[in-house]
Amino acid sequence: MSAPIIAIDAMGGDFGPRNIVQASLACLTATPSLHLALVGQASLIEELVSAHEAVDRSRLRVIHASEAIAMDERPSQALRGKPDSSMRVALELVASGQAQACVSAGNTGALMALSRFVLKTLPGIDRPAMIAAIPTRSGHCQLLDLGANVDCSAEALYQFAVMGSVLAEILGVATPRVALLNVGTEDIKGNQQVKRAAGLLQAASGLNYIGYVEGDGLYRGEADVVVCDGFVGNVLLKSSEGLATMIAARIETLFQRNLLSRAVGALALPLLKRLQTDLAPARHNGASLLGLQGVVVKSHGSASVSGFQSAIQRAVVESRENLPQRLKGRLETMFQDGRT
């Protein structure tokens, strides 16, 4: 797919369309083959777009949606009470084939509910899972679920593992190492759901399941795909982001204490900048909703301009790789024994 069209929910997130429009236009400039559809209050979006010079309007559409979903709104209200919300209209563009992916920084619960309703799940998948890249010592790993499913059955964890493995392959990992996040690596550790999921994964053909991994093993890069329920995954993700921000702030403070530390800091500045870039939450912003019949990427509600750009770029990669269809083909093979 040479010219993907990405539908952007311009009204979602903590900051409304300001950051979203700026990030979208930056991506449009950086990627000549990209086409975008900005969905939301058309007059406001047009005003923000007009403030930027040299915008290629031939690759940009503004689509009006009369409603927006609040960050604290109940998913049921968003689903039933707002048929013309920017989030829903963006998803419907994907469902109708007018766009290849949707990116939203809006209400996570509403996005999950609307995505399942509008796009439907792939055969063999009960619920989508949120997945994102987590930095490790050797690069990064794919972690799922990140909050879409707080409580998960063993079968759901199994499905997540298969989907995560396929995504890792698409991103260039030849034989992804798949692990379950647990409180220990011994077989006796973990709750019943995790133990049952381990049994399903051990019996699966075509999956490189390596067993359990603990939290520190995740950061050492012991696995390429790490699977857990959404409660654990969300806590881990936000703790990781908070830790990265805290470390960067502490290092900056240490190097500002006195003249000597400032001199040392100046010498180490290139390395520190590289470390800060590698660990910056904005660089890893964008969690995919795997298991849908369409590409959907969830951005942090508080994402910066660069952070939202990362989410758009993730959607571009997944749409170009035709992720849903590749997932569908692999799932048919993995689930042919009827285990779903």
Swiss-Prot record:
A biological-process GO annotation: phospholipid biosynthetic process
Catalyzed reactions per annotation: a fatty acyl-[ACP] + phosphate = an acyl phosphate + holo-[ACP]
Domain of life per record: Bacteria
Primary site of residence: cytoplasm
Localization of this protein: Cytoplasm
Keywords for this protein: Cytoplasm, Lipid biosynthesis, Lipid metabolism, Phospholipid biosynthesis, Phospholipid metabolism, Transferase
Molecular function GO labels: phosphate:acyl-[acyl carrier protein] acyltransferase activity
InterPro entries: FA_synthesis, Phospholipid_synth_PlsX-like
One Pfam family named in its UniProt record: FA_synthesis
Signal sequence range: none
One GO CC annotation: cytoplasm
EC nos: 2.3.1.274
Pathway in which this enzyme or protein is active: Lipid metabolism; phospholipid metabolism
Family statement: Belongs to the PlsX family.
Purpose of the protein: Catalyzes the reversible formation of acyl-phosphate (acyl-PO(4)) from acyl-[acyl-carrier-protein] (acyl-ACP). This enzyme utilizes acyl-ACP as fatty acyl donor, but not acyl-CoA.
Complex and partners: Homodimer. Probably interacts with PlsY.
Descriptive protein name: Phosphate acyltransferase
Organism: Pseudomonas syringae pv. syringae (strain B728a)
